Every structure is written in structure tokens, then in C-alpha cells.
Regions:
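A cross-kingdom feature that marks ATP-driven nucleic-acid transaction machinery
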Residues: 301-460
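Phosphate-binding site recognition
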Residues: 1-335
């Protein structure tokens, strides 16, 4: 299976593990984001290293110890080994690594941490004792982000002992598209709008089928491969799913302000909704976003679902659960998904893709001057008694740059460009650059203050 993307993360892990001294690595991120495959890929390039890769279980210490002992014996070419406990096994590996390179990977570390009392302290004691005389590298990996983050906090026994802490995020649109290169740029936008940047989801996409057929077979038809992916993930993380479903339902329909979400979701109280939103934010499924020109104004802040599959699921599958069970899968898609997906959902997601494009260009030094902030811009227009927000605006040392994203079947014309700029300037926002993203190209000419970006550029 070809390994795709993650070049920067892979390079950082390899550099750390190839160091001559004892090293400890922490890798964490949401489920399905590709942590295990990333670690395995990094290990393939390590020569003369004995590797013990153990996927921890939600069982007892004794059960984990027995399984891990077998792997240790195999990796070191020893006869069957027996240890009194995990502490003794860890100490054994540190001693063995005094004259050889050994890497121990504990995948889903929180499971073993639950089973072994004081495991963080056990590791701390052995690391401190052998930091200078052992070449045992330890990689701790886990999907429970809050637990994994706590390992590098000041109160943790492992504080100051982790040489590389890497939070693995979903891929952006550009890297995600490498999983389905045969599709057109338009199709790639639609696929990312559903499957996002999770490698596990993207590997399931069949390039011999249409976007529509992939969505039906993987998400919307009863029994689809990813039918229960969103609810099962949330059920494992959230205790009160009724409230979560209500909040998701409101967010998926486009409500983002606190008061609007509370009213539309029918959650019993503000504190109850705050608990749900805080949890969803910690899971990085929802983000709280404030205007870049008024970042402390709570009234102008909004909540947005940033995980595409969760957004798609709650907008179409969860909302239409009864009809989905009654209709043929293709009829269901055509009746309850197709039109809104093309006219509203994908154009909305295209704005996020455009933001990702700008961030990618900015990080690689292709935007001058580089911007320090990107987000929505809130405006008040007293003359016309209106207020609102522009969706994609960046801020740099020279001021603001405005970007408009159009995912439509006709080109952006010069008239549209002029009208958009006039509308922006009428609000009092002065920009040194106006950028336009277009699905279907342009029938307009660039000037010294405009920049045009089409899909081939974005995926090139």
C-alpha cells in the first residue's frame, strides 16, 4: 500500500529516531488520521534497529504484558520471556539497548496507561536512569487527544522528557487529492467536501466510479462502509449524544451564532450546550471562529463544523434518516442530497479549500507579503444600515487582502470583479489586494491589485 503525504511529519520523526541518544516521541491525533501508518513508514527506513511495535489493548496489565513479552522476544531473537510486570519489561529493554538500537512503539498508549497504575511514572524512572547509557527509543501513540496532550503538561511525570510531540491533523485538500488523482479538479473539490483529509476515508474512494456513486456506496446508502463512522466516534467520546445530535443538526444547517444554535437545537440550557460545544471543539470537529478584525468580540464569533464527513452526515444522513430507510439509495441521493450538495454545500466547502490554498502558499513563501492572520472580516455599513462578514480575508503588514470564492459553472467576468471590489470598498474596508477563486475560469483581466486563481492552479 502506497504511503501518501505527510512528508514534513515523516522527516521530523525520522530525524528524532535516528539521533544517537535515547529519544522519546509522542504522536497523537483523532482516530483514522493515519498515526499508525505514519509511524510504520518512519520505521521502514531505520536500519540496524530492533523494533517492538505493540498495539495496546483495553484489557488487564497481565494480558498486555503477556502479548508484549512475546513481541519483545521475537524482536530480540530471544527464547520466550516472562516478566513480573510492565515495569520489569521496560527496564529490560533499556538494559538491552545499551549495546544495540531498539525502538519500542506503544500504539493506543492510553489503553495500557489505564491498565497499569502509574505507567507514566514507570517510564519516567527508567528514562531518567538510562538517558545517558541506553539507545532505546520510545514512541507513544494515541487517539485520545486530551490524555496524550496531558503527558507533556507540567504536572505530568513525563514533562520535559518528550523530545518530539507531534499532533497529526487531517490532511489539507491538496494532499487528500493524492488519494484520487484520476478525478478532475471539480470532482476533487466535491470529494474533499465529503471525505475531508482523513486517509482512512480517502483510501476507500473508487476512482473507477463517479463522485455520486462513491458517496452513495460509502456514506448514504443503508449499510454503507462509513455509515456509522461519525456516530460511533462521537458515542465513544461524548456521554450525552442527544444534546450533541441537536447541536450538530443546527450547525449543519448553517446556524453558527450562539443564540441561533441554542434556539434551533432545543438543547435545554446554555450550560448544557456549552458542555457539548467545548467537547466538540476539543475533538477538533468544531471550531469557534471570531472575525480577524474583532477577535475578542463574543457576539460576532461563530461555531463551525470543520470535519467534512461529520458535516455531510448531519446535513443529509442523520436529518433524513427515515426517508433513507424507505427509498432506493439512488432515489434518496437525488431527492435529498444532490441539489443542495451542488448548489450550497460544495460552494461552502470550497471557501474552506481556498483558505487552505492560501495557507499552503503562505507557508511556502509564495505570498508577498506573508500574512499573519486569515479568517472572516466583520463589517458595519451605517450608510446602508447593514452589517455582515466577508468569508476569506487575510491580514499582513500592509493591511488586508480580500478573496472571493466562486464555485459556479460560469466564468467570473470583469463586471463581477468590479462589483465585488466596489461592494467591499463601500463597507469601508480598504484592501491592497483582491483575489478571486473560480471553478470555471475568468473572463476578466488581472490588474496590479487583483489576482485570479483557478482550479488547475490550486491542484497543480
Amino acid at each position: 500500500m502506497e504511503f501518501i503525504g505527510r512528508e514534513r511529519e515523516l522527516a521530523r520523526i525520522k530525524k528524532t529516531l535516528k539521533a544517537p541518544e535515547q529519544r522519546n516521541v509522542l504522536i497523537y491525533g483523532r482516530r483514522r488520521v493515519g498515526k499508525s501508518e505514519l509511524i510504520k513508514q518512519a520505521l521502514t527506513d531505520l536500519s540496524d534497529v530492533a523494533t517492538v511495535y505493540y498495539e495496546c489493548r483495553q484489557t488487564s496489565e497481565a494480558d498486555n504484558l503477556e502479548s508484549l513479552s512475546v513481541l519483545v522476544a521475537e524482536a530480540l531473537s530471544f527464547p520466550p520471556l516472562a516478566f513480573a510486570g510492565i515495569r520489569e519489561l521496560i527496564e529490560f529493554l533499556f538494559v538491552q539497548a545499551k549495546d544495540k538500537n531498539i525502538t519500542l512503539v506503544l500504539d493506543e498508549y492510553p489503553y495500557l496507561r489505564d491498565a497499569v497504575k502509574g505507567l507514566d511514572s514507570i517510564l519516567q524512572t527508567s528514562i531518567d536512569a538510562h538517558r545517558e547509557d541506553s539507545r532505546l527509543n520510545i514512541v507513544l501513540c494515541g487517539s485520545y487527544v486530551e490524555i496524550m496532550k496531558s503527558l507533556i503538561e507540567h504536572e505530568s511525570p513525563l514533562y520535559g522528557r518528550i523530545d518530539l510531540a507531534l499532533e497529526l491533523k487531517p490532511m489539507d485538500y491538496f494532499d487528500a487529492a493524492k488519494f484520487y488523482p484520476a478525478f478532475s479538479p471539480e470532482d476533487k473539490v466535491q470529494l474533499y467536501s465529503v471525505f475531508g483529509g482523513i486517509p482512512f476515508y480517502n483510501r476507500l474512494i473508487d476512482q473507477s466510479q463517479s463522485v455520486r456513486d462513491n458517496i452513495i456506496e460509502l456514506v448514504t446508502e443503508p449499510g454503507a462502509r462509513l455509515e456509522s463512522e461519525v456516530p460511533s466516534y462521537l458515542n465513544a467520546e461524548i456521554s450525552k449524544m442527544t444534546n450533541a445530535n441537536e447541536v450538530f443538526g443546527a450547525l449543519a444547517q448553517g446556524y453558527s451564532r450562539w443564540g441561533d444554535v441554542l434556539a434551533q437545537s432545543h438543547v435545554s440550557s446554555g450550560p448544557a450546550m456549552a458542555d457539548v460545544l467545548d467537547k466538540l471543539i476539543s475533538l477538533e470537529i468544531v471550531q469557534k471562529r471570531a472575525p480577524i478584525n474583532d477577535p475578542t468580540n463574543k457576539r460576532k464569533s461563530g461555531y463551525f463544523v470543520v470535519d467534512p464527513l461529520s458535516l455531510f452526515y448531519y446535513r443529509y444522513v442523520f436529518r433524513n434518516a427515515s426517508a433513507r430507510q424507505l427509498l432506493d439509495p439512488e432515489v434518496f441521493y437525488d431527492r435529498h442530497v444532490s441539489q443542495d450538495f451542488e448548489e450550497n454545500y460544495v460552494p461552502h466547502m470550497f471557501e474552506e479549500i481556498c483558505r487552505q490554498y492560501l495557507v499552503r502558499q503562505n507557508r511556502t513563501g509564495k505570498i508577498e507579503p506573508a500574512f499573519d492572520a486569515i479568517g472572516k472580516y466583520w463589517y458595519d455599513d451605517p450608510a446602508n444600515k447593514t452589517s455582515g462578514e466577508f468569508d476569506v480575508v487575510t491580514q499582513d503588514p500592509e493591511g488586508y487582502a480580500f478573496y472571493e470564492a466562486k464555485f459556479r459553472k460560469s466564468p467570473i467576468t470583469q463586471k463581477m470583479v468590479d462589483e465585488e471590489i466596489a461592494q467591499v470598498e463601500a463597507t469601508g474596508l480598504k484592501c491592497h489586494r483582491y483575489g478571486f477563486f473560480s471553478r470555471s475560469g475568468f473572463e476578466a483581466g488581472e490588474s496590479d491589485r487583483t489576482v485570479f486563481i483557478d482550479l488547475p492552479q490550486m491542484f497543480g
